[in-house]
Amino acid sequence: MKTLNVLALVLVLLCINASTEWPTHTVCKEENLEIYYKSCDPQQDFAFSIDRCSDVTTHTFDIRAAMVLRQSIKELYAKVDLIINGKTVLSYSETLCGPGLSKLIFCGKKKGEHLYYEGPITLGIKEIPQRDYTITARLTNEDRATVACADFTVKNYLDY
């Protein structure tokens, strides 16, 4: 009987480890706007939420994001790509943390520490484009190691 229990446990653990993708999470879903995300970091998922889906249509809205850091953050770089029909149509990059530059409260955090952000973000655009598209966001540190990575799927049919 013990052998059967051990075998069942081993099979469950193997099946769990065999998965190479994280689940798709729903950020918000309303009549004309849906936003989903999936971690594109094979080693780590994270939590992300928006208070109200309709807030996204304003150019500043509140988010919550949380994770345990697998990499220290002395320097932090963001790269964001807008992908439509499988083609990158817009790419944006920015240094968020670096020597003499700390745009975020978690600059300087160490590996293993909890990262939690709750507050406003500004998109820098007046309207979210209508249609279905993907936004890939990747944060890397000074060693070019992935700190966080996500693919956001946006389905926007709002009339402005």
UniProtKB/Swiss-Prot annotation:
Keyword Signal found: yes
Protein's name in the database: Lymphocyte antigen 86
Disulfide bonds: 28-53, 40-149, 97-107
Subcellular localization(s) per the UniProt record: Secreted, Extracellular space
Organism: Gallus gallus
Signal peptide as annotated in the record: 1-20
Function: May cooperate with CD180 and TLR4 to mediate the innate immune response to bacterial lipopolysaccharide (LPS) and cytokine production. Important for efficient CD180 cell surface expression.
Tissue specificity statement from the Swiss-Prot or TrEMBL entry: Detected in the macrophage-like 10.4 cells.
Induction comment from the UniProt entry of this chain: By myb.
GO biological processes: inflammatory response; innate immune response; positive regulation of lipopolysaccharide-mediated signaling pathway
Subunit composition and interactions: M-shaped tetramer of two CD180-LY86 heterodimers.
Superkingdom of source: Eukaryota
Keyword list, A-Z: Disulfide bond, Immunity, Inflammatory response, Innate immunity, Secreted, Signal
Name of the gene encoding the protein in the UniProt record: LY86
InterPro entries: Ig_E-set, LY86, ML_dom
Predominant localisation class: secreted
GO (cellular component) term, any one: extracellular region
Pfam families: E1_DerP2_DerF2
